Each structure stands twice: as structure tokens, then as C-alpha cells.
């Protein structure tokens, strides 16, 4: 068995339903994403259904600035929870680990959307915004720190598309997109836990005895590791908009799976005198004699502990089908709804080394299909003021048996509230507040992580993630 320390849950960030950023505009946040493919209240509709661009009769530019804050909590379900810290501390049943503050617990999400009518039938559009994102921040000493204590996922999408009116009631559209992928994960590397899992019972005690006798360096204390990955992909989207009456619109769109096949980056392990000495011991010390007996490949293990290593991954983001209904019920009230289908069953979490192709880590998740349902309304109490509200829900795509701390995906609900002020026919300002409330779920039950020594320690807890969105949107018409 290879003595491979370097993965330690490097792949466990957010590809599940909770990472898809449907909060493209302030109005969209306020209505919890209802009516996205049919309402066309602003130019962000290019992200959801390019066919609905035909609703625009003037040039429109939408600038959006949103702040998303993330709260991460962990509660231990057992005593002696997680591998001991350097000072011997472990979690206790019912102990609460919370981290809800700090500037690094928030994401800034800008967005730019443009719609330009070319003639009465053709409208082109452009957008630049975040399509997926997640931020998790746990306390440094929480029991699952070996499976990842911080993660940051951002996917930026550039869309260029058009909408074309085939008939007075039917429009079609398409866009092409370029997506830029960024991922950063931090974790604590616990050498003692990894050694105890790697060899037969007594391996750790044998190394401690050898260290006491001067035949080996001490097994190092915990240290930090970090993975940064970059990648890109192209994709496309097609949509249609049907307007059976002047009050009702039905929109639908489909986007195939996004395949990030060339993601590469760097894994860094913080090195100190202790880790350097242990790595040298693996390369040529007593372990070269005893290692084969214990099933440990010392030179290979030393290579796995190099402080800088190139890593790669191939990731498939889900395809997406969306259908929306918008109805202008009265001069003061609009009603809307959206159903979204996202298939995550081909999404896998796997990393390899660039240098030799060996597995860094494979984290089974058995992702499922996500179904989301959203309803919302616009209410105009005054001529220049419109109030927005919405509610939505979506199922989680991973179960209690495989869920991991930095992907605490579970069933969730969306709440939105906001208002738009239109001081003139050329300008609209929107303020919005939204909440994503994710059900707390069990973590630490996944026994299928391979290699076993990188699974992050024996921990069992409850992970809870909630997010809040504050958004400002400015629409200008020309």
C-alpha cells in the first residue's frame, strides 16, 4: 500500500445543487428565482432563457452587486470525535463548533447583463456573472478538519446570445458561453491519523518507539495543506418563449452538461523541520527495511509529501432544464413560477497527480437529480414602486451515508424579498434580500473514500450551512 498523505479530501467542494447560482439579479433574488425563463423583467434573462430577450424594445444595461454570507456550524455526534489535535483535544458528543464571522466568510458576486435590439424581431445580449459558487469556513479545530475546513468555489460564465421572434407569440433563442473555474480548499493534514490507517495495527506505536530510540524522527504534528485549481470550458443553451396572451408567458430552456476536462492546479503542504525530517526518513531511513513488511512504499510516500505538487481533475457540471410561467394578473400584481431539473449523476469527485497519474483521492457521492420549485410575485403599490417576494425549495443530491463537511448539501428552501424604484423610464434601482436555508445533515459516515489514509480521521457530526444574499441592481435603458 502506498504511504499517500496528500489528498485528505481535496475534492470535496460544492458541485451539488446548492452551488448553482440562480441569484443573477436583485429582482431574481427578491422573487427567489421564480419566473426566471419567462418574466424578462431585466437583461439577466439571457442567463436563463435567451429567447426571452425579444421582450426588450430598447437597449438595456443591468449592473448587479451582491454579497453572499455563509454560516457553517458543526455539532459532534460522539465522544472522542475526530483525530486529536496537537494538544490532544477531541470533540465531545453535543459539542458545537461555530464560525460565523470574518470578512472571509463572504463572497462578492458582481454581474453585468446587456440586451440590444437589432430590429423588431432580433435582440442580442451579453452577460458576465457567476454561475456556481460556495464558501465554507469551519473552526480550525473542528473534528472534520482533515476532510477540509475551508473551501471556495467560483465559476464565472460569459454568455453571448440572441433571441429571435418567429411569430408574434413565439420566440426562440440561443447563447454560447465560456466558463472559468476556480477552486481553493484548505485542510489540516494529521500525520498520526494517516499512519494509523495506513499500516497494520501497531504501526503508529512502532514508529513512536523507533523515534524514542533515535531510529526515526517523530511523526509530525498537524500542518496545513491547500489546493488551488483552475480550468475552463465552453457550452451552449437554447430556449423558447411562448406568449399565448398579452398577459401570459411560458418560457423553457435547456443547457447540456458542462465538461471541465483540463483543470489543473497546485497542491501545497506547509513544510517545517518535522515534516521535512519525516519525509527524508521515508525516502531512505529504517522504513526502507521495515516498510515492505508493513505494506509501506517509503520512497513513494516521500514523493507524496513533497511540499509542492501539480494536480489535475476532470469535472462534469449537470445539464439543466428550466420552465417558467409568468402571468400579469392585474395592473398591480404579477404571478410567476419556475421548475428546474439538474442531473448530477455524472458528477464525480476525483483527483490525480500530474507527474505520475496516481490517484490523489476519490470521494464517492452518488449524486442524484435535483428538482427545484419556485413561486413569486410582483406587487405595485405605487406607480414607481414595485415590491417583490418569492419562495422556493429544492431537494439535496447526496445522502447521510456519503455527505462531507465542505459539501453539506441537503434539502433547502429559498426566501426572497425586495423592492424596485423606477424614478424615470430610463432607470430602475432594485434592492433585495434572500436566504438559502439548508437542512442540517449528518457527516462522517462516508467510508468509501480512497485511499483510506486520506479520509480525514474518524469523525461523526451534524453539519449546517445557511447563506444570505444582499443585492443592489441598477438598470439603465437607452
Regions found by a protein language model. Give the residues of each.
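Short N-terminal alpha-helical targeting/association segments
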Residues: 4-5, 41, 311
Amino acid at each position: 500500500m502506498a504511504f499517500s498523505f496528500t489528498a485528505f479530501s481535496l475534492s470535496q467542494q460544492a458541485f451539488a445543487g446548492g452551488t448553482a447560482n440562480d441569484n443573477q439579479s436583485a429582482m431574481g433574488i427578491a422573487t427567489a428565482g421564480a419566473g426566471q425563463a419567462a418574466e424578462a423583467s431585466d437583461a439577466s434573462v439571457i442567463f436563463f432563457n435567451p429567447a426571452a430577450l425579444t421582450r426588450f424594445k430598447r437597449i438595456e444595461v443591468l449592473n448587479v452587486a451582491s454579497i453572499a454570507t455563509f454560516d457553517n456550524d458543526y455539532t459532534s455526534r460522539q465522544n472522542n470525535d475526530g483525530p486529536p489535535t496537537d494538544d490532544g483535544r477531541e470533540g465531545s458528543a453535543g459539542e458545537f463548533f461555530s464560525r460565523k464571522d470574518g470578512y472571509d466568510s463572504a463572497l462578492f458576486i458582481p454581474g453585468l447583463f446587456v440586451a440590444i435590439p437589432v430590429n423588431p424581431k432580433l435582440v442580442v445580449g451579453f452577460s458576465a456573472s457567476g454561475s456556481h459558487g460556495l464558501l465554507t469556513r469551519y473552526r480550525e479545530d473542528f473534528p472534520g478538519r482533515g476532510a477540509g475546513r475551508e473551501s471556495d468555489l467560483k465559476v464565472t460564465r460569459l454568455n453571448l446570445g440572441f433571441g429571435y421572434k418567429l411569430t408574434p407569440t413565439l420566440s426562440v433563442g440561443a447563447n454560447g458561453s465560456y466558463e472559468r473555474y476556480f477552486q481553493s480548499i484548505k485542510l489540516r493534514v494529521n500525520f498520526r491519523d494517516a499512519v494509523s490507517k495506513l499500516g497494520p495495527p501497531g504501526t503508529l506505536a512502532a514508529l513512536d518507539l523507533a523515534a524514542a530510540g533515535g531510529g526515526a524522527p517523530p511523526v509530525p504534528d498537524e500542518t496545513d495543506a491547500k489546493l488551488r485549481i483552475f480550468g475552463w470550458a465552453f457550452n451552449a443553451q437554447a430556449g423558447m418563449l411562448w406568449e399565448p396572451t398579452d398577459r401570459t408567458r411560458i418560457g423553457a430552456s435547456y443547457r447540456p452538461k458542462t465538461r471541465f476536462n483540463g483543470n489543473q492546479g497546485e497542491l501545497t503542504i506547509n513544510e517545517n523541520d518535522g515534516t521535512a525530517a519525516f519525509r527524508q526518513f521515508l525516502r531512505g531511513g529504517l522504513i526502507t527495511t521495515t516498510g515492505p513488511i508493513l505494506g509501506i512504499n517509503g520512497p513513494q510516500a516521500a514523493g507524496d509529501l513533497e511540499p509542492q505538487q501539480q494536480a489535475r481533475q476532470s469535472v462534469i457540471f449537470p445539464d439543466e432544464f428550466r420552465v417558467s410561467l409568468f402571468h400579469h394578473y392585474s395592473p398591480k400584481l404579477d404571478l410567476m413560477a419556475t421548475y428546474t431539473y439538474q442531473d448530477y449523476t455524472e458528477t464525480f469527485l476525483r483527483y490525480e497527480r500530474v507527474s505520475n497519474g496516481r490517484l490523489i483521492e476519490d470521494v464517492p457521492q452518488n449524486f442524484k437529480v435535483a428538482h427545484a420549485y419556485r413561486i413569486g410575485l410582483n406587487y405595485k403599490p405605487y406607480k414607481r414602486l414595485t415590491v417583490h417576494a418569492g419562495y422556493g425549495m429544492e431537494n439535496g443530491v447526496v445522502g447521510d451515508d456519503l455527505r462531507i463537511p465542505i459539501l453539506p448539501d441537503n434539502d433547502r428552501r429559498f426566501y426572497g424579498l425586495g423592492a424596485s424604484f423606477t424614478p424615470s423610464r430610463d432607470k430602475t434601482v432594485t434592492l433585495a434580500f434572500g436566504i438559502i436555508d439548508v437542512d442540517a445533515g449528518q457527516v462522517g459516515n462516508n467510508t468509501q473514500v480512497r485511499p483510506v489514509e486520506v479520509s480525514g480521521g474518524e469523525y461523526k457530526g451534524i453539519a449546517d450551512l445557511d447563506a444570505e444574499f444582499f443585492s443592489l441592481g441598477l438598470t439603465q435603458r437607452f
